Amino acid sequence: MSTVDPALLGAYQTAEYVVLDDPPIVFQIGVEHQGLSLLLLSFGAESACFLTAWNPRSEVLSADENLDRQMRLLALIETERLNYFVGRGESSDGTWAEDSYLIFDLDRKTAMQWARTFEQNAWVWVPGVGPAELVITEY
């Protein structure tokens, strides 16, 4: 099991997760968002995950390093032929933001594997109906 700093967990819990649609969909952990549910429904998706490749284990990397990692994640998404939206996770106090993807119908087990591959502390599970859930990455 992974141990994540409690302050980081708090930041993840209160962050805003933004799906860059028109208009953008902004959701939070533990709060059901009708627009997000409708987006999944419109793609025939049963679930989604919100995942980034930025800043492994919260180690701040350069913009170029983060872009390279994010492109590798995108290559995995496209190889699996999954529908996705570009997104962004943003702290509630505005001190950090990370580019992300909302990935449709990636099963939970594979999402966990991808989170491990990109050394993420946590990621977000989005059920078709119900609130988004913060998932701590298991190492």
Q: What are the residue ranges of the model-derived segments?
A:
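N-terminal, charge-rich interaction modules
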Residues: 1-75
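Mature, function-bearing regions of proteins
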Residues: 28-33, 74-78, 87, 91, ...
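Ordered hydrophobic segments in well-structured contexts
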Residues: 48-52, 85-86, 100-104, 122-125, ...
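Generic structural motif
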Residues: 54-56, 106, 139
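Residue-level marker of positions within ordered structural domains that often coincide
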Residues: 56, 78, 116
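Short, surface-exposed beta-strand/loop "edge" segments at domain boundaries and coil↔beta transitions
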Residues: 57-62, 109-112, 133
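Amphipathic protein-protein interaction modules
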Residues: 67-110
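Short, compact, well-ordered microdomains
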Residues: 96-131
